[in-house]
Amino acid sequence: MKLLKSHPFLSLANSYVIDSPQPSNLNYAWNFGSLLALCLGIQIVTGVTLAMHYTPNIDLAFISVEHIMRDVNYGWMIRYLHANTASFFFLFVYLHIGRGLYYGSYKSPRALPWSIGVIILILMMATAFLGYVLPWGQMSLWGATVITNLLSAIPWIGKDLVEFIWGGFSVDNATLNRFFSLHYLLPFILAALAVMHLLALHEHGSSNPLGITANADRLYMHPYYTFKDLVTIFLFFLVLALFLFYAPNKLGHPDNYIPANPMQTPASIVPEWYLLPFYAILRSIPDKLGGVIAMFGSLLILLAMPLLDLSRVRGSAFRPLMKFFFWLLVVDFLILLWCGSQHVEEPFITLGQFATTFYFSWFLIIVPVVSVIENTLIDLATENKS
């Protein structure tokens, strides 16, 4: 124990992971940090291993993935572990953000860790998109073509920017090479941002379900919360193993097992399931530029939450009206996810437009208005009591 506190490096780990004082009333909604760190670790290790056998060439990429699956020892397991952990990574991130929205973890003095977290989410989406292109199946090629083409909506520089990203006049070998390079690099940037997220969080400590300062009653991180984290970690391993060994392609798209063919467009071009809500927002705006702005705006609006929430009460635990609207947002997000997976036809177009309208209304109208109503009711109750 003495070495843990005196060694220059071990003392850092001790203050952040072992002796870190945490509120005594944290529930399982605070376990996602450890799960996300574990997912990122798995992704980096499996990703580096896969990169040793992958060839970023349009003639060899699909074959090299099949080589990994068939000839590399446990290559099938490493690839499926990488693909399915990515799905759980996003699931945990969405739950982590949902917990932050519900319990008001974005409010001062924790606006900085919240902002870093939103940047992490955006980079994660970019990394996932780049990785989806690498197997060079039908979804890879056409997904890359559709998504990169969105940048052509930017006035004046759009067309030149798209050709700069492609490295030519279409998605080709240069595109695959640079996508592979960036997909390899970004997880390490994500790891650095995750450390910054932890450093910023350590400044004021974790929030808690009550939304009040917890200085009066705290517990050490170890053994109390490390063992609590292990419960959800083992549960995660169990569910991940079920997908890995029994349904490894359940969350993927079968068209990506067809080699990329620029002469044949798939019946429907859809991204991975975890990007579908934002894909639905993109599709719901008829104008190309408007759709791109809406898609990026749906992510960047999270950065404005510390300014939009005017309530004096942190979180929704003691705010019945806000609690009701929070669960409406959850339902709306699931509707967007479902709409994004469907063909671009009625009633999914109209439903997606309604869901998109509600999504932005929740942040820009509902949150500030409900905050003002609740503050007014608190003032009236205080005056009547006095």
Swiss-Prot record:
Pfam families: Cytochrom_B_C, Cytochrome_B. A ubiquinone binds at H202. Heme b b566 binds at H96, H197. Belongs to the cytochrome b family. Binds 2 heme b groups non-covalently. The chain crosses the membrane at residues 32-52, 76-98, 113-133, 179-199, 225-245, 289-309, 321-341, 348-368. Its main location: mitochondrion. Component of the ubiquinol-cytochrome c reductase complex (complex III or cytochrome b-c1 complex) that is part of the mitochondrial respiratory chain. The b-c1 complex mediates electron transfer from ubiquinol to cytochrome c. Contributes to the generation of a proton gradient across the mitochondrial membrane that is then used for ATP synthesis. GO terms for molecular function: metal ion binding; ubiquinol-cytochrome-c reductase activity. It is a multi-pass membrane protein. GO terms for cellular component: mitochondrial inner membrane; respiratory chain complex III. PANTHER family: CYTOCHROME B (PTHR19271:SF16). Heme 1 (or BL or b562) is low-potential and absorbs at about 562 nm, and heme 2 (or BH or b566) is high-potential and absorbs at about 566 nm. Keywords: Electron transport, Heme, Iron, Membrane, Metal-binding, Mitochondrion, Mitochondrion inner membrane, Respiratory chain, Transmembrane, Transmembrane helix, Transport, Ubiquinone. This is Cytochrome b. It is found in: Mitochondrion inner membrane. GO terms for biological process: mitochondrial electron transport, ubiquinol to cytochrome c. Fungal cytochrome b-c1 complex contains 10 subunits; 3 respiratory subunits, 2 core proteins and 5 low-molecular weight proteins. Cytochrome b-c1 complex is a homodimer. Heme b b562 binds at H82, H183. Its cofactor is heme b.
